Amino acid sequence: MGQNFSKKSGNDLVSRIVFTILILIVCRFGSFIPIPGIDSIALSSVAAQNQSGILGMFNMLSGGSLGRMSIFALAIMPYITASIIIQLMSVAYKPLENLKKEGEVGKRKVNQLSRYLTVLLASFQAYGVAISLESIVTNTGPVVILAGFFFRITTVITLVVGTMLLMWLGEQITQRGIGNGTSLIIFIGIISGVPSAIISMFELSRKGALSPLIAIAVCIGVVVLIAIIIFFERAQRKLLVQYPKRQVGNKIYGGEATHMPLKLNTSGVIPPIFASSILLFPATLANFSNSNSETMGMLTYYLGHGKPVYILLYVALIMFFSFFYTAIVFNSEETANNLRKYGAYIPGKRPGKNTSDYFDYILTRLTVIGGIYLSVICVIPELLMNKYVISLSLGGTSFLIVVNVVLDTMTQIQTYLFSSKYEGLMKKVKLKN
């Protein structure tokens, strides 16, 4: 009976993995379906000229969908942005914060708000894309075959539906598959661009534009970079938490000690994405509007990849968002109150404000190290891309996303296998009894 249970659990895991793979294949197929009214030849020339900047980054996150202007061109980014905005608002807006504390019902309401905001953001972005496409004219002709109201409305509807479909597919993976659906959709998009980036690098090496030694050094550097990311993403500070002893009759219960793990990089991959988006916005605006103003030209130049001003601002923004997002993810005061509620305490620290201040002290030190780690991981590839013209799909942000998603998915699979074995063991014990 125990063997049958174990076999059933194994089959369930396999079916979840197969389901996840099938959904991701659907996402890849959708990224090749173009929106109506686009001249693909003219569009490909525009995409080739905008491989850097925020367009290149979003094209990387969408798995090339933006460059092909497919139905998934906006990718799942409006949903992620909406979720982050709701998260930020829950800190500043008290009713929303109270809603999050209402358990499962409150969680469903917050998710519904995120969906409404996703539709709104996707609509604005889709309309902006439609207007921008209409203004682009290449040597082969305009990108839009027949500009006008009909093209704009069909583009908005198509792109919004594409984003909502991706959001729904991501939720299906989370519920019925394995891993976080949203993260896996971004992951598969980034991975899809890696082969072309490798081919491009070897082509540069073959033509003599890139030294073979440099190409080998880049490959070794990638392995080292992945190892560093794994080390820092797994690194954590464990705080000792003591529970009081309780006497029930003649027996004493409790009194055990446990550990509260605090991640070194609590903010995750959000700071580099936000920092890149802010810094590359002027260049994107100039590209879309075809602006020839001197001010816009200076901004575009100084905020170009690898420029000293860009690097300094990039590091400053990464550090800022590291602290900002860590404060949202980990609420020191709330955690300290929860410990006091259950009678737990940090040895040597009084429950309440003293414990909260201690959490803030530890988190500040961890966030400084985490912010420096994120800055180094993101800045070094930027400098290499600027010097050796390496594809953006090999950037620091993409490495962070890929490694984090792989680690999280592996952890979930291990947890699933462990829980299945535990359930099988408990079933055996019940049968024997």
From Swiss-Prot:
Gene Ontology biological process: intracellular protein transmembrane transport; protein targeting; protein transport by the Sec complex
Major localisation: membrane
Coiled coil residues, start to end: none
Domain of life of the source: Bacteria
Membrane topology qualifier: Multi-pass membrane protein
InterPro entries, A to Z: SecY, SecY/SEC61-alpha, SecY_CS, SecY_dom_sf
One matching Pfam family: SecY
Parts of the chain that traverse the membrane: 17-37, 71-91, 117-137, 141-161, 184-204, 212-232, 268-288, 310-330, 366-386, 388-408
SUPFAM superfamilies assigned to the protein according to its UniProt record, in alphabetical order: Preprotein translocase SecY subunit (SSF103491)
Annotated keywords: Cell inner membrane, Cell membrane, Membrane, Protein transport, Translocation, Transmembrane, Transmembrane helix, Transport
Protein's cellular compartments: Cell inner membrane
Cellular component, GO, one term: plasma membrane
Function, as annotated: The central subunit of the protein translocation channel SecYEG. Consists of two halves formed by TMs 1-5 and 6-10. These two domains form a lateral gate at the front which open onto the bilayer between TMs 2 and 7, and are clamped together by SecE at the back. The channel is closed by both a pore ring composed of hydrophobic SecY resides and a short helix (helix 2A) on the extracellular side of the membrane which forms a plug. The plug probably moves laterally to allow the channel to open. The ring and the pore may move independently.
Subunit structure: Component of the Sec protein translocase complex. Heterotrimer consisting of SecY, SecE and SecG subunits. The heterotrimers can form oligomers, although 1 heterotrimer is thought to be able to translocate proteins. Interacts with the ribosome. Interacts with SecDF, and other proteins may be involved. Interacts with SecA.
Family: Belongs to the SecY/SEC61-alpha family.
Protein name, UniProt field: Protein translocase subunit SecY
Source organism per UniProt: Rickettsia conorii (strain ATCC VR-613 / Malish 7)
Gene this protein is translated from: secY
